[in-house]
Each structure stands twice: as C-alpha cells, then as structure tokens.
C-alpha cells in the first residue's frame, strides 16, 4: 500500500513537469515552422531579434499665428467625428507598391487613428485663428450655427516609384445647423514627396501634407461661413 501511494504521489509531481515540457516543445515547434516559412530570408530571426513596433505622431507643422478678426467670430462651429474606410480607420501606417494595392507597415503605426487626429488638429487650428466664437465636437451637446463633417478618403505612402510620396485626401461638407441644408462640399487632396522609402520618411511627408491640407481646409471653411446663408 505504501509503495502504491508513493507511486501515485510521484505521478502527481511529474504531471506539472510534463505540462511545462509540452509547452516548451510546442513553442520550439512553432519557431521551427516559422523559420521554415521564411524561405526568402537569409536566416531565421529569433524572437529577441524582432524589432519593436514604433508609433508616430501626426502633427501640424504650422506655427501658431495671432488670432484674426472675422465676421463669423460670433458663430459656433460643430465638428462631427471623421469617418473613414475600414482599411484606413486604424493606427496602422499604410503603404502601396502598385495602384489598387494597399498594405500595412509591420513595425510602424500612428499614436492615433489619422482621421481622428486630423479632426483634432483642424479644430485646434480654427480655434487658434479665432475664426469662430467656439469650435466644438457635435458630441459636446451644445447648439451651433454650422456642422462640419469630414471623411478620410486616402492616407497612404505610395512607394511605387522611389523614393515615393504620400497621398492624403479628405472630403468635407458644411451644413447649416438651423436650416439643415448643405452649404458647401469639397474634396481636398495633397501629394507630397518622401525623402526615403521607409516609415520615418513617410511620417515626415505626412506631416507636411497634413499641414498644407489644414491650411486649405481652414481657409475654405472660413470663406464659406463668411457668406450669407440663404434659407
């Protein structure tokens, strides 16, 4: 009886060891399979050699200027959250090697989704220019005079021709809040050359493109709102 009890105890102690051994074997097998799939590589990269994923901030490079008086300074602009196609509605940095083809950078991304970030930068820009009494999100629960809706149409690094360029397109629509009518619509597009075929060069070009885009959008919004609204 004592021998049987000892055998049962020994088996119970061996069970966790076997489980750990099996997990190690599975991990080794997964690494071997991963190496086997990478036939185009010069060797197999260990998990320790995989570079960390880097995140970049999309920024407005324009220097803040003095607020400028405007006829529409007493009005309130409400801004809807930007919409985007599912492929661009992500923090992944997108590139394209050929027309109609898109892919994600493996080790590079944005700190915020580009559509959301562009909306934030545009609101800051309009606030700084003093174009409106207030610029707020439609979710703020306040009344406004105009509602701005935007959609991110394109936002990618085109690497089809070295060193490539970035493509940014945004469509915008201004609505008269009281009359519930569309006042104006426009599509903005910027293509800026990149200095290299890598994520860092793409981000620098994206910042320049976004800055120019914000220049155009701000001027357009102010110009449209300055016109009398026909109801």
Predicted regions and their residues:
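Sec-dependent N-terminal signal peptides
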Residues: 32-37
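Generic short beta-strand segments
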Residues: 82, 151-155, 189
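C-terminal motif of bacterial Sec signal peptides marking the signal peptidase cleavage site
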Residues: 40-43
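Bacterial N-terminal signal peptides that target proteins for export
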Residues: 3-31
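A structural "domain/chain start" motif
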Residues: 45-114, 224-231
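Short secondary-structure boundary motifs at beta->alpha junctions and helix caps
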Residues: 101-111, 178-219
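Sec-exported extracytoplasmic/periplasmic mature domains
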Residues: 123, 127-131, 218-226
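Surface-exposed short loop/turn segments
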Residues: 45-66, 70, 124, 129-179, ...
């Amino acid at each position: 009886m004592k021998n049987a009890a000892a055998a049962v105890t020994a088996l119970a102690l061996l069970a966790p060891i076997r489980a750990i051994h099996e997990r190690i074997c599975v991990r080794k097998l997964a690494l071997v399979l991963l190496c086997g799939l990478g036939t185009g590589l010069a060797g197999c990269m260990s998990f320790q050699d995989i570079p960390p994923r880097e995140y970049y901030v999309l920024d407005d490079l324009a220097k803040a200027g003095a607020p400028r008086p405007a006829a529409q300074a007493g009005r309130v602009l409400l801004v809807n959250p930007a919409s985007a196609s599912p492929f661009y509605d992500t923090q992944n940095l997108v590139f394209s090697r050929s027309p109609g083809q898109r892919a994600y950078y493996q080790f590079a991304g944005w700190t915020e989704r580009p559509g959301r970030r562009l909306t934030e930068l545009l609101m800051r820009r309009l606030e700084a220019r003093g174009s409106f009494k207030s610029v707020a999100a439609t979710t703020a629960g306040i009344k406004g005079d105009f509602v701005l809706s935007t959609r991110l149409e394109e936002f990618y690094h085109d690497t089809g021709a070295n060193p490539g360029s970035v493509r940014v397109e945004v469509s915008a629509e201004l609505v008269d809040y009281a009359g519930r009518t569309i006042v104006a619509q426009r599509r903005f597009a910027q293509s800026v050359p990149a200095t290299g075929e890598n994520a860092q060069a793409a981000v620098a070009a994206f910042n320049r493109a976004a800055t120019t885009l914000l220049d155009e959008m701000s001027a357009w919004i102010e110009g449209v709102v300055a016109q009398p609204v026909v109801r």
